């Protein structure tokens, strides 16, 4: 049905200029709006005057000859849509449809031989009529998925049952992809993928399962599904920077990647490097980082030669100003190091530990703490020990300086433990680095003293010249005074 909510312009007009300036007032207004939107408007198209539904006989009471025709009649009856924004209209018809949908779900779940070829058309029509619609822009242009409550679909009492029915249909032992492919085609899948932008997380969860089932059963649609997901992500990265269903699509991709045959195709490697790695730059990374990191690690477990370009890609996009994202990147790096091969580790140890050294030195204690936790990982410790000659010189200066200067006592304690571990790995190198570090510090202190001494002399010289100038001016004044007196 058409939305009864006010247009976005009217909503924004309700916020005064002073409220826009005052962030606290603005937030309270947004909170009030959020509460009003807890049940969002149904996005279904208006059908004009509604047809009143009348209950059909129960399927279980019909004879076997009548059941198939009655099944199709019920499917057709459920194509009629209702306005859930009007809580008092069509109550009887809404309840009849809800009960009918429940009955259809149970019917296909508990009976064999009911999904016959002639029923496929009516089944897909009913599903399409109920779930496919144009999703409107968010009611709140300042919507923050991490803070704000999503707009829930008002007609969920019916849509939920349609999704339940769809899943039972796809999972039925009687389901035949060879027949269904006439109706579940590229256009159908494209519309399904567009629904992943729904704000309602309940709907996205159903869509995730439905798309996964379709991918598994329709071999001819697999390449198309991957391509369309690729397009959605590219649009998300480079154009809109907004899509509600990124986490769900990545979750599906995780299992798809897991099933890729070896050797990996060039298109799959390109997807990793051109789509998944650049996705780390997204503002809302926290909403889908766990699923994104899982996909990346799945690729590396499939093909270890991808490790170097992946880590170099992450280092290229390393956050400069967002500590929360740095912590996420460090977590992902640890997941990658958990599956890395020693030969691949040697290729990236220098640039990687230069970045880890910077993170350890971070004034943000969570970033420093997350980087230092690498030394709690037994496998990473073994890799460090094998390559201690390269890694210790990179890390030493930062660690030693932090042990003396960091503001957070927890970080200082962690650094002492790391230094102790590194010293046990190679005591001689550790002592050499300690001596050279102290010597360097002495040289720096000496230079600093020399600089201070030089500035002191310059100040004295400046003062001396100023006094000389002042005396010269005084003497000239005296001479002129004496001359005029004579």
Swiss-Prot record:
<feature type="region of interest" description="Disordered">
    <location>
        <begin position="1"/>
        <end position="52"/>
    </location>
</feature>
<dbReference type="GO" id="GO:0019900">
    <property type="term" value="F:kinase binding"/>
</dbReference>
<dbReference type="InterPro" id="IPR002554">
    <property type="entry name" value="PP2A_B56"/>
</dbReference>
<dbReference type="GO" id="GO:0005634">
    <property type="term" value="C:nucleus"/>
</dbReference>
<dbReference type="InterPro" id="IPR016024">
    <property type="entry name" value="ARM-type_fold"/>
</dbReference>
<feature type="compositionally biased region" description="Low complexity">
    <location>
        <begin position="1"/>
        <end position="18"/>
    </location>
</feature>
<feature type="modified residue" description="N-acetylserine">
    <location>
        <position position="2"/>
    </location>
</feature>
<keyword id="KW-0597">Phosphoprotein</keyword>
<keyword id="KW-0158">Chromosome</keyword>
<dbReference type="Pfam" id="PF01603">
    <property type="entry name" value="B56"/>
</dbReference>
<dbReference type="GO" id="GO:0000775">
    <property type="term" value="C:chromosome, centromeric region"/>
</dbReference>
<comment type="function">
    <text>The B regulatory subunit might modulate substrate selectivity and catalytic activity, and might also direct the localization of the catalytic enzyme to a particular subcellular compartment.</text>
</comment>
<keyword id="KW-0137">Centromere</keyword>
<protein>
    <recommendedName>
        <fullName>Serine/threonine-protein phosphatase 2A 56 kDa regulatory subunit alpha isoform</fullName>
    </recommendedName>
</protein>
<dbReference type="GO" id="GO:0007165">
    <property type="term" value="P:signal transduction"/>
</dbReference>
<dbReference type="GO" id="GO:0005737">
    <property type="term" value="C:cytoplasm"/>
</dbReference>
<feature type="modified residue" description="Phosphoserine">
    <location>
        <position position="42"/>
    </location>
</feature>
<keyword id="KW-0007">Acetylation</keyword>
<feature type="compositionally biased region" description="Low complexity">
    <location>
        <begin position="38"/>
        <end position="51"/>
    </location>
</feature>
<dbReference type="GO" id="GO:0005813">
    <property type="term" value="C:centrosome"/>
</dbReference>
<comment type="similarity">
    <text>Belongs to the phosphatase 2A regulatory subunit B56 family.</text>
</comment>
<feature type="modified residue" description="Phosphoserine">
    <location>
        <position position="49"/>
    </location>
</feature>
<keyword id="KW-0539">Nucleus</keyword>
<feature type="compositionally biased region" description="Basic residues">
    <location>
        <begin position="27"/>
        <end position="37"/>
    </location>
</feature>
<dbReference type="GO" id="GO:0030018">
    <property type="term" value="C:Z disc"/>
</dbReference>
<dbReference type="GO" id="GO:0019888">
    <property type="term" value="F:protein phosphatase regulator activity"/>
</dbReference>
<dbReference type="GO" id="GO:1903077">
    <property type="term" value="P:negative regulation of protein localization to plasma membrane"/>
</dbReference>
<dbReference type="GO" id="GO:0005886">
    <property type="term" value="C:plasma membrane"/>
</dbReference>
<dbReference type="InterPro" id="IPR011989">
    <property type="entry name" value="ARM-like"/>
</dbReference>
<keyword id="KW-0963">Cytoplasm</keyword>
<dbReference type="GO" id="GO:0005829">
    <property type="term" value="C:cytosol"/>
</dbReference>
<feature type="modified residue" description="Phosphoserine">
    <location>
        <position position="41"/>
    </location>
</feature>
<dbReference type="GO" id="GO:0000159">
    <property type="term" value="C:protein phosphatase type 2A complex"/>
</dbReference>
<dbReference type="GO" id="GO:0031430">
    <property type="term" value="C:M band"/>
</dbReference>
<comment type="subunit">
    <text>PP2A consists of a common heterodimeric core enzyme, composed of a 36 kDa catalytic subunit (subunit C) and a 65 kDa constant regulatory subunit (PR65 or subunit A), that associates with a variety of regulatory subunits. Proteins that associate with the core dimer include three families of regulatory subunits B (the R2/B/PR55/B55, R3/B''/PR72/PR130/PR59 and R5/B'/B56 families), the 48 kDa variable regulatory subunit, viral proteins, and cell signaling molecules. Interacts with SGO1.</text>
</comment>
């Amino acid at each position: 049905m058409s939305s009864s909510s006010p247009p976005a312009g009217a909503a924004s007009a309700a916020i005064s200029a002073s409220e826009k300036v005052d962030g606290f007032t603005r937030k309270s207004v947004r909170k009030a709006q959020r509460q009003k939107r807890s049940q969002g408007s149904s996005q279904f198209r208006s059908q004009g005057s509604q047809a009143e539904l009348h209950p059909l006989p129960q399927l279980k009471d019909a004879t076997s000859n009548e059941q198939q025709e009655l099944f199709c009649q019920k499917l057709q009856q459920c194509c009629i849509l209702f306005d859930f924004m009007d809580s008092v209209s069509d109550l009887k018809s809404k309840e009849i449809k809800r009960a009918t949908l429940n009955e259809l779900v149970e019917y296909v779940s508990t009976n064999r031989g009911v999904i016959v070829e002639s029923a496929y058309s009516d089944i897909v029509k009913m599903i399409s009529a109920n779930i496919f619609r144009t999703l409107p822009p968010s009611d709140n242009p300042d919507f923050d998925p991490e803070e704000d409550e999503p707009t829930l679909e008002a007609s969920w009492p019916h849509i939920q049952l349609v999704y339940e029915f769809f899943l039972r249909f796809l999972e039925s032992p009687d389901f035949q992809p060879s027949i269904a492919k006439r109706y579940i085609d590229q256009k159908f899948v494209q519309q399904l993928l567009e629904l992943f932008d729904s704000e309602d997380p309940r709907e996205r969860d159903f869509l995730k399962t439905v798309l996964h089932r379709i991918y598994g059963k329709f071999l001819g649609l697999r390449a198309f599904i991957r391509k369309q997901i690729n397009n959605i992500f590219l649009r998300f990265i480079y154009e809109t920077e907004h899509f509600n269903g990124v986490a769900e699509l990545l979750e599906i991709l995780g299992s798809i990647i897991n099933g890729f045959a070896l050797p990996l195709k060039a298109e799959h490697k390109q997807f990793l490097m051109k789509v998944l790695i650049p996705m780390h730059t997204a503002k809302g990374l926290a909403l889908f980082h766990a699923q994104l990191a899982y996909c990346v690690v799945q690729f590396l477990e499939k093909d270890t030669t991808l490790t170097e370009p992946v880590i170099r890609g992450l280092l290229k996009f390393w956050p400069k100003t967002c500590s929360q994202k740095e912590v996420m990147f460090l977590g992902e790096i640890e997941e990658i190091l958990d599956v890395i091969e020693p030969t691949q580790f040697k290729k990236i140890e220098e640039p990687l530990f230069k970045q880890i050294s910077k993170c350890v030195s971070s004034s943000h204690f969570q970033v420093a703490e997350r980087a230092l936790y690498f030394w709690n990982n037994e496998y990473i410790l073994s890799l460090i020990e094998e390559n201690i000659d390269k890694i210790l010189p990179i890390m030493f200066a930062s660690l030693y300086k932090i042990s003396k200067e960091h503001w957070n006592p927890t970080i200082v304690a962690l650094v002492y433990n790391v230094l102790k571990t590194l010293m046990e790995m190679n005591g001689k190198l550790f002592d050499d680095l300690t001596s050279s570090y102290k010597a360097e510090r002495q040289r720096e202190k000496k230079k600093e003293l020399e600089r201070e001494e030089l500035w002191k002399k310059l100040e004295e010289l400046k003062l001396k010249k100023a006094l000389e100038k002042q005396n010269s001016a005084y003497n000239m004044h005296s001479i002129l005074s004496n001359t005029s007196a004579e």
